[in-house]
Amino acid sequence: MSALSIISIIIGWIYFACWSLSFYPQVILNFRKKNVIGLSFDFLLFNITGYACYSVFNSVLYFDKLVKNEYYDKYGPPIPVQQSDIAFAIHGFVLTAITIIQCFIYDRGNQKNSKLGIGIATLIWVSLIVMTILGFSNVFTWLWVINYYSYVKLFITFIKYIPQAYLNFKNKSTSGWSVHNVLLDFSGGVLSLLQMFLDVADSGNWNIFTGDPVKLGLSLFSIAFDILFIIQHYILYRNPKSKGYQNLNDNNIPNNNNNNNNNINNNTPHQIIINNSLIGEEDQ
């Protein structure tokens, strides 16, 4: 095994760690707040569909000898999937499922999946079922079928962040969406690209890019949207204002009991005063 191969494996596990750890800040944030307000449900629906596809693609290409030989005949060795890719895909599916469970347990306000999001996800799942049936019917090779799974994952990676970016824009806030998730995801994307370039340098086979476009696209699209989320969090919506609440410190609270009674009488039932905090406090 060459030095570049060893470095590639090490980088693969590092980016696996970054991408895998990127799921936990959101889960922890939801648990700490006991609500999922500010987290897009369409993003979660797309995400679990994407990781289901990615898990199938990586596992079949890595473990199935027939599919692996079909890949060698078309692209030549090596296959663009390592054990870290399989572990990452399955781990991503499980953690996304846990986050979805949190949406049923914790307060979600009036948030729900959009009809457009449900419609897109339904069409995707129907197409996957049809392609799998065609694979068992020998209409297409299994390499073609699992490549379709990878293209679906690539498509989902392109669209899945749009609902969350729009929700942040609509709320003029990134509250409820963990920035640590974004920073770890960005690091993983950069390292994934670096690993692919090292594999090309080691083997001299540029088909590593064309043979696994989903891995390349996953890195590029993730990096692009991570940059957008970083801009939203640190530049556009640095000081979000929670709607419908006042943030008062102790010096702003009147001490005169009569004034307190007058204030209570003058306030509408919908006005809520909260000392020293904002509802939906930003995850910094």
Swiss-Prot record:
Gene3D superfamilies: 1.20.1280.290. GO terms for cellular component: lysosomal membrane; vacuolar membrane. It is found in: Lysosome membrane. The chain crosses the membrane at residues 3-23, 37-57, 86-106, 116-136, 139-159, 181-201, 216-236. Keywords: Lysosome, Membrane, Repeat, Symport, Transmembrane, Transmembrane helix, Transport. Residues 4-70, 154-208 form the PQ-loop domain. GO terms for molecular function: L-cystine transmembrane transporter activity; symporter activity. It catalyses: L-cystine(out) + H(+)(out) = L-cystine(in) + H(+)(in). GO terms for biological process: L-cystine transport. Residues 247-269 are annotated as: Disordered. It is a multi-pass membrane protein. NCBIfam families: 2A43. Belongs to the cystinosin family. Cystine/H(+) symporter that mediates export of cystine, the oxidized dimer of cysteine, from lysosomes. This is Cystinosin homolog. It comes from Dictyostelium discoideum (Social amoeba). The gene is ctns.
